[in-house]
């Protein structure tokens, strides 16, 4: 496997992934720039868009890690991004939440995309990015134990059956050790509700992302069920965009290195195997 650091290759990979086609096993595209990212001023989003941006320029080729192997700690979020050179901070200008870290190549691509969107009157902000195992455990257990209501209900009261309770949470939240957010490749953009993307402003953003995000390597991985032959997994998330040049690489490695013995250490973990969460929610 070789790594190709061109945005043209990224676009091919992302478009293939977004259309449901498997990526070329022989190529993993990883965009990485040695230059610091620059940020631009956001115009008023009510202004009419200017001409569409030109396709991004090519980036330099980068070396793949030894053996092209993704270490287990990256797959399950067992890292501190502030101490890991694989991660970078999202510039404050492009943040809409408190989760500031992402895989450095994904951050670079997101900044490029946000800059080009801004120049055309579209404001993109990451409201969530990397989450550690501990972060995801807190989200999951708050829902599992009724601290955070799900659909207006405390699931520890309304849904005592462990498998049924896990399935309800899995509509929109991942089990710890199974979230794509562990990889730092996935960004929640602008809002965490599908209803927002049906508003005038939200639809405008979503339409731009649908048309242009693949140019930068991003794909909406949780599209509407049934629309693209996706019978299982999470419900549609119009806000969730994945940087496929790196994420597809991690996804290929995940079922090789992560077994159900690794999906443990949180309330409700015993349901993971019964649900076959790796097959139905990760792959």
Protein language model regions, located:
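Extracytoplasmic cell-surface/polysaccharide-interacting catalytic and binding patches
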Residues: 18-283
